[in-house]
Amino acid sequence: SYRALIIAGPSEKGQELAEIVNSGKELTWDELDSANWGVMSSSSPAGYVYPSLWLQDKYGKGLTDLSSAVQSDSYASALARLASGQVDCILAYADVRRDYEDKWESEFGAKNSIWEDTNVIGVTDPIYNDTVCVSKNSKNMNDDLKAAIQKALINIGNTDEGKEVISIYSHKGYQEAQSSDYDKERDAQKLIKELSK
């Protein structure tokens, strides 16, 4: 799993929001709504869906309720807009700053490092990107087979050879999950259905 971040940039408004959070206070909806936002496509888990759920959980509002939100076609363009002050906040996957650290100053024109210029002002629930699932409807599936598959996959991820095999998926290993671990994913799927109406 990974998380999405709500990242405030170097603009005056971005720094104002970061200062509030860094002082230990909660941001209000009006404070968030006063910013210019950079969002990704409505199908993006980290750049739209999970941050929208975060807003719903905290404020009872969604991204569509923001007064000023522009869609970016890539995380690079979102960060370029953030660096230039065109937007005050962006929504992105947790490692985005590390992935674009070199480009922040060299290509996006920022004056300081990405770590000096940006602040995390929100963190979403975990996003479960990849899963191994079994069918509840299969006549061949039973608890013993389910446990054996689970154990085998976890064991594969615990060996050097297995890690090499699963690295093609950028996986580092597997762990047991419960149905309740995916409650937020169910909420995300509901939101996606609503957005596509």
Predicted regions and their residues:
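Short helix-initiation/N-cap motifs at beta->coil->alpha
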Residues: 62-80
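Periplasmic-binding protein-like
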Residues: 1-5, 108-146, 150, 167-176
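Hydrophobic residues within well-ordered alpha-helices
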Residues: 32, 82-83
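Second-shell loop/turn segments in exported
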Residues: 36-45, 68-69, 136-139, 171-176
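Solvent-exposed coil/turn segments that connect beta secondary-structure elements
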Residues: 9-13, 42, 94-96, 126, ...
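A ligand-binding cleft/hinge motif common to bilobed small-molecule-binding domains
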Residues: 54-57, 83-84, 88-115
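An extracytoplasmic/periplasmic, membrane-proximal ligand-sensing/linker region
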Residues: 140-197
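A conserved helix-loop-strand patch within extracytoplasmic ligand-binding domains
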Residues: 1-46, 51-56
